[in-house]
Amino acid sequence: MILTAMQDAIGRTPIFKFTRKDYPIPLKSAIYAKLEHLNPGGSVKDRLGQYLIKEAFRTRKITSTTTIIEPTAGNTGIALALVAIKHHLKTIFVVPKKFSTEKQQIMRALGALVINTPTSEGISGAIKKSKELAESIPDSYLPLQFENPDNPAAYYHTLAPEIVQELGTNLTSFVAGIGSGGTFAGMAKYLKERIPNIRLIGVEPEGSILNGGEPGPHEIEGIGVEFIPPFFANLDIDRFETISDEEGFSYTRKLAKKNGLLVGSSSGAAFAAALKEVQRLPEGSQVLTIFPDMADRYLSKGIYS
């Protein structure tokens, strides 16, 4: 493949098949992981960044002089900055201080201005600050992934069709982490339309609220919510699996050591939940999960320590 723009390499990521060779997976069952960390920006959010900017141009919400502003834990910012290069757009990202320095460094390397908000305010504080900036900066656009229906649409139209084309419609369960909720909601909608009996399992860290707990700190980045994503209004989710930091990081290290998969801790959490799910199911079940991002942006967090 010859490229003239890195944005053209987004998508068409490989799928990794796990069997009982390395993990306690029942006979004839399998876990399939879509390796979204292999996108050029290092995460599944590359698809979102590309889709948001394409749709914003199509609907004339932005022009070549617009400044893109977005609250982000990092990966959406990286994705938007990567795609913005192609269109010569300015980018400003608001990031809570708690998130990894590597992601912030990558955003800056791609030309973005990064503004930090207090850790104690969480992503809600970053959203508030982003809205204030959008009101004060002329010719600016705030995609706001946490509310924008283009978020799940990005995965409904790109990621989900790729997976069904590659794996068919014999999947038993879809297991994936939930952050903004867009990846999960877009995937779930597409899969349910084609595989009505597929089980939907959302994955969250301890300190997230989907299982009815109180919001609190957690070390697993990229998943976990302080509020219920609006995209879940019409989704019939079978269960939420809560994974501890210890378990998520443990499987992240195992995936590197056993399989050479250098993925972030949200992937370790997703795999831990996928293992629990496949062990609950009859032999011959097929479980799908997503590995959202790379490990290299979490080294300062001691991901392999």
UniProtKB/Swiss-Prot annotation:
Disulfide-bond pairs as recorded: none
UniProt entry keywords in alphabetical sequence: Amino-acid biosynthesis, Cysteine biosynthesis, Pyridoxal phosphate, Transferase
One Pfam family hit: PALP
Pathway: Amino-acid biosynthesis; L-cysteine biosynthesis; L-cysteine from L-serine: step 2/2
Amino-acid biosynthesis is among the record's keywords: yes
N6-(pyridoxal phosphate)lysine, modified sites: 45
The organism's place on the tree of life at top rank: Bacteria
EC number(s) per entry: 2.5.1.47
Catalysed conversion reaction: O-acetyl-L-serine + hydrogen sulfide = L-cysteine + acetate
One Gene Ontology molecular-function label: cysteine synthase activity
InterPro entries, sorted: Cys_Synth/Cystath_Beta-Synth, P-phosphate_BS, TrpB-like_PALP, TrpB-like_PALP_sf
Enzyme category, top tier: transferase
Residue numbers binding pyridoxal 5'-phosphate: 75, 179-183, 266
Entry cofactors: pyridoxal 5'-phosphate
Gene Ontology BP terms: cysteine biosynthetic process from serine
Subunit annotation: Homodimer.
Protein family according to the UniProt entry: Belongs to the cysteine synthase/cystathionine beta-synthase family.
Protein name: Cysteine synthase
Gene source species: Helicobacter pylori (strain J99 / ATCC 700824)
Lineage, opening ranks: Bacteria, Pseudomonadati, Campylobacterota, Epsilonproteobacteria, Campylobacterales
